From Swiss-Prot:
Residues 11-46, 51-86 form the EF-hand domain. Residues 382-626 are annotated as: Actin-binding 2. Phosphorylated. Actin-bundling protein. In the inner ear, it is required for stereocilia formation. Mediates liquid packing of actin filaments that is necessary for stereocilia to grow to their proper dimensions. The keyword Ribonucleoprotein does not apply. This is Plastin-1. Ca(2+) 3 binds at residues 64, 66, 68, 70, 75. Monomer. It comes from the Eukaryota. The keyword Transport does not apply. The lineage of its organism: Eukaryota, Metazoa, Chordata, Craniata, Vertebrata. Residues 122-238, 266-377, 396-505, 517-626 form the Calponin-homology (CH) domain. Residues 108-381 are annotated as: Actin-binding 1.
Amino acid sequence: MENSTTTISREELEELQEAFNKIDIDNSGYVSDYELQDLFKEASLPLPGYKVREIVEKILAVADNNKDSRISFEEFVSLMQELKSKDISKTFRKIINKREGITAIGGTSSISSEGTQHSYSEEEKVAFVNWINKALENDPDCKHLIPMNPNDDSLFKSLADGILLCKMINLSEPDTIDERAINKKKLTPFTISENLNLALNSASAIGCTVVNIGAQDLTEGKPHLVLGLLWQIIKVGLFADIEISRNEALIALLKEGEDLEELMRLSPEELLLQWVNYHLTNAGWPTISNFSHDIKDSRAYFHLLNQIAPKGDRDDGPAIAIDLTGFSEKNDLKRAEFMLQEADKLGCRQFVTPADVVSGNPKLNLAFVANLFNTYPGLHKPDNNDIDVNLLEGESKEERTFRNWMNSLGVNPYINHLYSDLADALVIFQLYEMIRVPVDWSHVNKPPYPALGGNMKKIENCNYAVELGKNKAKFSLVGIAGQDLNEGNSTLTLALVWQLMRRYTLNVLSDLGEGEKVNDAIIIEWVNQTLKSANKNTFISSFKDKSISTSLPVLDLIDAIAPNAVRQEMIKREDLSDEDKLNNAKYAISVARKIGARIYALPDDLVEVKPKMVMTVFACLMGKGLNKIK
């Protein structure tokens, strides 16, 4: 280690020892490289996931002195010194929950077969299996797979043909995948691979990070990757309605002196916490500040269940009586079991076992609470005429597409609300790096921001983001100032975000075309040439061409790139009603994803001929076509 490396104080050393002990679950004196990556995921680093992984890989080469893919405490300290010297560990949190029930498996890929270990949580596997079994128990397409046994590895085998994953994505975000595009019968390795591509590209389109997962990983059932993807998909569904514009009853959670805009900026996790505390306050019980330590004794849960259970006096069904006698049970595990028996009366015994409650598993307890909220929120929209209803307008489809695109790339923090979550420009900087615009991170103010002058720090970031856009990225940002980003001016923010997405899309094409700069005219020419070569009658004059509303140019292009991928009997070609156009568009988007095109656009974008999103569809298909030639 070079002498220029930052020294670590005795106080910091003690904190590191404490953190190390918490992830050294078997007290062996070592943690695996994968646990280290998990640790960084837990830390609030203003860097995207892929960047953290790169750093860890590079530094492991130095820190893992004996190359055993395990890190001792001494190696861990030298690793932290390296990170401190790179100005990355400033926001390192020492609160890492001790994780129990971790299964470690040896690496299986050719790269990791030299003895790396990946760990996965047995509890998560059991919880997800039970959730999927219940969710898909009546689906005829899943009869050969459901029910899965939570106590063996059947989950990893059952997901291998892609059908379950596609079904779970549609449960979380209905209509994401056109069922006609899923291969269901007489599956071959090729048609299974198509299903997995469809699942991965569709997961990406709903905001899941899939940058390091390939179809092969799912075929091989790599547990840590499968569980990571499943959790993201399940979470999208659990959190879908924990959003004020979609669920106005959440306005009831407004605290004294809090305005609606503050409430609307909260993440689903923060809203859930506020929801639990709203009911605990009504029950006269102390509030909680997390879904781990504070719920371990189950007592807060008893009160929550008692508050939200139907009383039979409204239109929420017959009364359900919650038995509180288990509340005074002395044994934590038994008390948790009594509590879950009461949750079962509400049809909500999901995600956690008594042991998961007592150990304070934050992920599974969050899922348990989200499911309770979705089933019995116990909220009623207040008759408050002071509420500005304009604030309750939900995000547009375009805004959601941009948000999902960013999240799928692994930006940190996760974007829940497009404008308020971009207010400090940290995610904008990460996107700049992804489009190869260099960011000088020493110019960037990082959280936590001070209470006084904190917003000024964010505006400085936004000013730098606009400056980079104009001078380095050569974007057209006329009339856009840093303050516009900070204040969430929708028109001006979208102008920047669109140019980021456009550049990202075109960079992929330039890489395939030996670096040749790609523009709209080149894409249109390639599309028409490819259609003509395949003897298709369709063509496009621009990305505003009205014929695109039928999706026929898109479907014909897919057929030209990947013959037999499109089933012609699924397409309506003449006398198209609005419903026919939408059906064609749904099928086109799903089949494009199935052949490997990572498309974020929605079927409506084709039907309504939204030129920006139409461009991304054709650009992604061109990328697929060029890749095939290579």
